[in-house]
Structure formats: structure tokens, C-alpha cells
């Protein structure tokens, strides 16, 4: 009887410790550097902003073939504001203003492709799409740590559900 009680105490304390200090950072705004370019403008620059990133708890069924899949949540924008910058050197007739999102708060929710990169493989890390800027090792090539904002899926408000 005492072994069962000891096991119960150890398991309950372990759960308490895990809930106080999550193993992975939760969904929250983090600082990020994004590449900004526009078709027709001969420049690619980087901007500092905040994006939503982090862990969202999810579950999966053990018997996936028998029961329907559970919806999976991802780290999404809750509150966002947009800021604009003017790209230098754009030719006459090309609007040099580009807007980008700044995450104010985040939430774990179903992935909405209209506002969120729902994952998947990326061709390139955070780089400019124009090949003139990709081969350069100048400051125009941003660090290879984040996906390019131009690689986001097309707008749609349909949530991504597991197959």
C-alpha cells in the first residue's frame, strides 16, 4: 500500500513541476527580422517586427484509422497592427510603400491561411525572392532563421485540418 501511495505522490508532483515550467516556450510574440521587397523595386531590405511563435498543446488519436482526426491548433495572431515603410530607389510609377504585420498578442487556434503560415517545407530561408539579392552576401540578405513572408500560402479563411 505504501508503494502505491509513494508512486501516486511522485506522479502528482511531477505533473505540478511540468505545469510550472513548460518544456517549450508557449505561443507568444517574438522579435523577428523579415525581408521586404516589392516587384518593380530594385531593393530588398530587412525590417524588425514581432511575429507569433511558440508551442501550442495538441493531441492526436492513437487509433487514427478508426476515429476522425482531432483539429490541430497552431500559434496565431490575436491582435495585430500594420506598419508601412517606403522602399528606396523604386522607379516612377511603382508605389514604394510596403506594409507588414506587427504581432501585439498571440493565441493557439486553428490555422487560418489568411493570417498564418500553416507550415510545410520552405524553398529558402528568409531571403529575398529576386535572384539578384539571393547570391549577395551583403546586408541585403537576411539571416537564414525565419521563413520568407512572401512564401505564405494564398489568402483563404479555411482552417487547415489534419487528413
From Swiss-Prot:
Glycans are attached at residues 31, 48. Pfam families: Cys_knot. Residues 129-163 are annotated as: Disordered. GO terms for biological process: G protein-coupled receptor signaling pathway. One of its GO terms (molecular function) is hormone activity. CDD domains: GHB_like. It is found in: Secreted. Encoded by a cluster of genes that have evolved by duplication from LHB. HCG-beta is encoded by six non-allelic genes (CGB) clustered on chromosome 19q13.3 and named CGB1, CGB2, CGB3, CGB5, CGB7 and CGB8. Two specific hCGb proteins that differ by three amino acids in positions 2,4 and 117 have been described: type 1 (CGB7) and type 2 (CGB3, CGB5, CGB8). The CGB gene first arose in the common ancestor of the anthropoid primates. This is Choriogonadotropin subunit beta variant 2. It comes from Homo sapiens. The lineage of its organism: Eukaryota, Metazoa, Chordata, Craniata, Vertebrata. The gene is CGB2.
